[in-house]
Amino acid sequence: MPEGPEVALTADILEKYFKGKTLEYIDFISGRYSKSEPEGYDDFIANLPLKVSNVDTKGKFLWFELFDPNDKSNKWYIWNTFGLTGMWSLFEAKYTRAVLSFDNELMAYFSDMRNFGTFKFSNSEKELKRKLNELGPDFLKNDDIDISKIKKYKQPIVALLMDQKKIGSGLGNYLVAEILYRAKIDPHKLGSNLTDQEIENLWYWIKYETKLAYDSNHIGYMVNLENESSKIGRKNYHPNIHPTEKEFDFLVYRKKKDPNGNKVIADKIIGSGKNKRTTYWAPAIQK
């Protein structure tokens, strides 16, 4: 599942190619929206063409900002979430669901094998701000998050980190597993039971892992933008963090052993019934 770093890098690439370009049409050619169009779609189409002014993200939420060059007060927003398998490309990939047509024959495509990704169209800046305010601070983009709030909650730390509203946003299954392993924290441990030192260490590894995943990431969640990813500069998030690895890699996520040979357990901790989510951890390391 694409997480904060992939979504942020995707937005960087989309902005590089499409900022200042004019969107002429968007068509849903397959998937969940081919029969039932997203909220606001008809009104949005009626206002095209529109020029892209910005592509941005918060956590795992991406949005386009567009305006009418003849009436700059006429602003529109495309909301997008990636779900489990959503990704953007500059070519028509397998499982393409949405096609965005720009001037000068430029195209952007959204593919989604499992169809959990979402779109919404809105001309309300207030509605967008309300959506953004519902999300916690972006773990990749913010240096001053008060994660000591973790101690307020008698919930497993793995659940608190994956909750997009309580502490921060942008972390999912793979990042939380890797962060807790690096921080040597048992994912079952309640937030209220973490020591100040554990929280300080946790915050360091959140910054470290999100930065590393953004800077150099080839784990497969944005393969359709692999070529473009290698050509674009990275923003200097968490400037005081200096990863020693050249590339992000999984140490415990979907592994049977960690790099030192310690057993990795796949544990269902979050959710209930069939919807429980699996996390990976090494009991010999994480206490």
UniProtKB/Swiss-Prot annotation:
Catalytic activity: Hydrolysis of DNA containing ring-opened 7-methylguanine residues, releasing 2,6-diamino-4-hydroxy-5-(N-methyl)formamidopyrimidine; 2'-deoxyribonucleotide-(2'-deoxyribose 5'-phosphate)-2'-deoxyribonucleotide-DNA = a 3'-end 2'-deoxyribonucleotide-(2,3-dehydro-2,3-deoxyribose 5'-phosphate)-DNA + a 5'-end 5'-phospho-2'-deoxyribonucleoside-DNA + H(+)
Keyword Hydrolase: yes
CDD domains assigned to the protein according to its UniProt record, in alphabetical order: FpgNei_N (cd08773)
Keyword field: DNA damage, DNA repair, DNA-binding, Glycosidase, Hydrolase, Lyase, Multifunctional enzyme
Record SUPFAM superfamilies: N-terminal domain of MutM-like DNA repair proteins, S13-like H2TH domain
Classification via InterPro entries: DNA_glyclase/AP_lyase_DNA-bd, FPG_C, FPG_cat, MutM-like_N-ter, Ribosomal_uS13-like_H2TH
Gene Ontology terms for molecular function: class I DNA-(apurinic or apyrimidinic site) endonuclease activity; damaged DNA binding; oxidized purine nucleobase lesion DNA N-glycosylase activity; zinc ion binding
One Pfam family cited in the UniProt record for this chain: H2TH
GO BP: base-excision repair
Record EC number: 3.2.2.23, 4.2.99.18
Residue positions of the active site: 2-3, 58, 277
UniProt-listed PROSITE patterns: FPG_CAT
Recorded family membership: Belongs to the FPG family.
Protein name: Probable formamidopyrimidine-DNA glycosylase
